Amino acid sequence: MSKSALPKRLIEIPEMRRIKSIHFIGVGGAGMCGIAEVMKNQGYGVSGSDIKESPVTKRLQSLGIEVFIGHDSKNIANADVVVVSSAIDRENPEIQAALKAQLPVVRRADMLGELMRYRHGIAVAGAHGKTTTTSLLTMMMTEAGFDPTYVIGGKLNASGKNASLGESRYLIAEADESDASFLTLHPMAAIVTNIDQDHMDTYGNSFDKLKAAYIQFLQNMPFYGLAVVCGDDKELFDMIDDIGRPVLTFGLEPHNNVQATNVRVDGTKTHFTVLRKDREPLELTLNIPGQHNVLNALAAITMATDEGVNDDAIKRALAKFAGVGRRFEQQACVAKDDGDVLLIDDYGHHPVEVAATIKAARASYPERRLVMLFQPHRYSRTRDCYDDFVAVLSQVDVLLLLDVYSAGEAPIVGADTKSLARSIRLRGEVEPVVVDKDELAPVMQRVLQAGDMLITQGAGNVGQLSQQLAANNLYL
């Protein structure tokens, strides 16, 4: 039987024994809400809690999921199992109540692994590009009629959601390396987009331990599984012999199994040609900009082709791809004096990701001045990538810096926003402006000019400012 015929089989997923009701602590998080939605659609009773109301919690409530705002031991009264995100402290009253009641308390990745247990799981890992790659692969397989279940770390703009329960044997999901929880997954196939020095505290500040974790992740596949890795990434390429599983590589270099050539940017679209062994060249148009997104698309194309997705479905998926929330997302053009300001919001929070955003913005809108409002994410990342941040942020025309979004970390001396601004100023390419979020309006009014593009950049709450701008020109 061909692979393309396999997904036509509808599957029956065994129920989790004795588990009827699931409670998610931190249900509004990007990684948690999708699993909660899928479990609800599978017929389980689902509840959740979060510290504040958000569009995500409101949407979950509209699906019939009971969401409590605030954490309280009473919230788990009807639960048979409690799922927690890595951001939740062990002293949380709901966790303590669950332990006292002898309920299982499991990590998000454990529940994702349970979803994957009886399915043909495809996991997407890597330092950068996971969400976009997962989304593109989901679109390709959906266009081909595979009807996969998917759990993505960002909202698919086309569907307005980041998870869906399909009827086929396929499950496509992001695999999170930040807390090493991706090691709990046992997929049938996996993509690694790249490897970089991020979340190093998890790995004892050892790059060798980080690389070993990726190898273990890929070795969690069965011996007949497939590893799709970026052959342009030297660290990944050097690891191939240690994987011990079938491997296909993708990239821009000719040694790869799947290669992109003739890459051209045309506004917000990217055109390129895909070369694959024993196939005719495939001319494609990707409906988002950036060479980094060509690599993301190649990763998805490589996996989709191996799974039996036809070229027409790949073409349609790339041409209609509307992007992912907070990934170079164009919010609006807002009026400014006798012109406008283009608002772009991006989640990237690592120097490599910020550099990719800047490159894509320059290529797409070369006539616009690039103003970036950057919010550093975590003191540890600012410390570990300090010199790279200084170099990358110096490439913009106007730089506004918000305080570090701590994500629960204690401040680190020399890794704060003022130190970062001082080093950028000494480099001499751009004059950074440190600004308090509550005093942003007058600074924006003074700095922004007609014809600018303003990029709100970071993984914290900076994206909310872009939404406010798009809604009512708050700072213009």
Curated annotation (Swiss-Prot):
One Pfam family cited in the UniProt record for this chain: Mur_ligase
Keywords linked to the UniProt accession: ATP-binding, Cell cycle, Cell division, Cell shape, Cell wall biogenesis/degradation, Cytoplasm, Ligase, Nucleotide-binding, Peptidoglycan synthesis
Catalysed transformations (reactions): UDP-N-acetyl-alpha-D-muramate + L-alanine + ATP = UDP-N-acetyl-alpha-D-muramoyl-L-alanine + ADP + phosphate + H(+)
Secretion signal, residue range per the UniProt entry: none
Enzymatic class: ligase
EC number: 6.3.2.8
One Gene Ontology molecular-function label: UDP-N-acetylmuramate-L-alanine ligase activity
Gene Ontology terms describing biological process: cell division; cell wall organization; peptidoglycan biosynthetic process; regulation of cell shape
Pathway assigned in UniProt: Cell wall biogenesis; peptidoglycan biosynthesis
GO cellular component, as recorded: cytoplasm
Principal subcellular localization: cytoplasm
Subcellular location: Cytoplasm
SUPFAM superfamilies named in the record: MurCD N-terminal domain, MurD-like peptide ligases, catalytic domain, MurD-like peptide ligases, peptide-binding domain
UniProt binding sites for ATP: G126, A127, H128, G129, K130, T131, T132
Function: Cell wall formation.
Family per record: Belongs to the MurCDEF family.
HAMAP family in alphabetical order: MurC
Protein name: UDP-N-acetylmuramate--L-alanine ligase
Organism encoding this protein: Psychrobacter sp. (strain PRwf-1)
